[in-house]
Amino acid sequence: MTPTKPKVYIVGVGMTKFCKPGSVPGWDYPDMVKEAVTTALDDCKMKYSDIQQATVGYLFGGTCCGQRALYEVGLTGIPIFNVNNACASGSSGLFLGKQIIESGNSDVVLCAGFERMAPGSLENLAAPIDDRALSVDKHISVMSETYGLEPAPMTAQMFGNAAKEHMEKYGSKREHYAKIAYKNHLHSVHNPKSQFTKEFSLDQVINARKIYDFMGLLECSPTSDGAAAAVLVSEKFLEKNPRLKAQAVEIVGLKLGTDEPSVFAENSNIKMIGFDMIQKLAKQLWAETKLTPNDVQVIELHDCFAPNELITYEAIGLCPVGQGHHIVDRNDNTYGGKWVINPSGGLISKGHPIGATGVAQAVELSNQLRGKCGKRQVPNCKVAMQHNIGIGGAGVVGLYRLGFPGAAQSKI
């Protein structure tokens, strides 16, 4: 019989406002991380000296940027792990932090993520160096053999071509993807941390400047500056600090995986963007936690481009394969429907500072479970789900709930 893993909780969260790159003069990544970490520590009324280990996710930057950033908060000699897993860097750091606590090596781990990006499209995610292999060259080969390559941002082509494949195989329409972007921009109106807080009409989404094929600017996540942080603790720590039980969010399950052989073997753009990886992880997550999609009320999902949200509905088990567009038709992805998906505005509207994204999802879900989201609060929020991916590839799916709902209720 497999021994039960120790429980891990999030007790403090914080994030900066996500901003257009360079829009805040003099705002460098150490400043961003300091703001997010300080907010997270204030949230749980802890000190940096309480932190025993830390993970910091980022994509663009040199070695030891995590140290450089956290040194602005304190120098305590703790182990600091820098995590680079493409767009899943932040959630990969959460996965590592959870494992550290489960191992018994630490009771308090800080997980942060940040990005300071250049303006423009998500063009050079793999930071290519001319004299060596590109981390996504095999993924690009799949795309070149199916739809070819065009002079457009590579990531937009990847997800745009996945949408074209879905349209051809399953009958989704251009409007389904526009409706997802419209919905996420509408959600972000009530998120003060969001990069965009403006409502756009469906016509504005459809008629926006085209980035690739049918896909317009408002269906693509922007480049962003920002940071997010979460404080993870063990159950043993909570027993010694019961004041934190009322706000403790249990990480019920968190799965990290990489690409399956089908990514390169089947010449499918849907599989190339990580469908099988996420589907496998989600099945494992549901089985291990003994929860189902019907138990979930809110989901933060990696909508780097609108097509990925629709396709992921199928991968995580919200509906059968090929029926993601029916969720859009039924409005089962927003308030009043079966799930509220991306109440924060998602990557499309909240912003996508790559290393911060996965941690920011956990921040939003923790605040939703704690009932702290104001006008965007999801009613009767009991179980929350996270989905974060990085092409190259890495995928993370997770489930969260209040660890001690009785304690939370007694505090109200």
Swiss-Prot record:
A motif (Microbody targeting signal) lies at residues 410-412. GO terms for molecular function: acyltransferase activity; lipid binding; propanoyl-CoA C-acyltransferase activity. One of its GO terms (cellular component) is peroxisome. InterPro entries: Thiolase (IPR002155), Thiolase-like (IPR016039), Thiolase_acyl_enz_int_AS (IPR020615), Thiolase_C_2 (IPR055140), Thiolase_CS (IPR020613), Thiolase_N (IPR020616). Coiled coil: none annotated. Inhibited by acetyl-CoA. It holds the Pfam family Thiolase_N. Catalyzes the thiolytic cleavage of 3-ketoacyl-CoA with 8-16 carbon residues in the acyl group using a ping-pong mechanism whereby binding to 3-ketooctanoyl-CoA results in the release of acetyl-CoA and the subsequent addition of CoA produces 3-ketohexanohyl-CoA. Involved in the biosynthesis of the dauer pheromone by providing short chains of fatty acid that are attached to the ascarylose sugars of the pheromone. This is Non-specific lipid-transfer protein-like 2. It comes from Caenorhabditis elegans. The gene is daf-22.
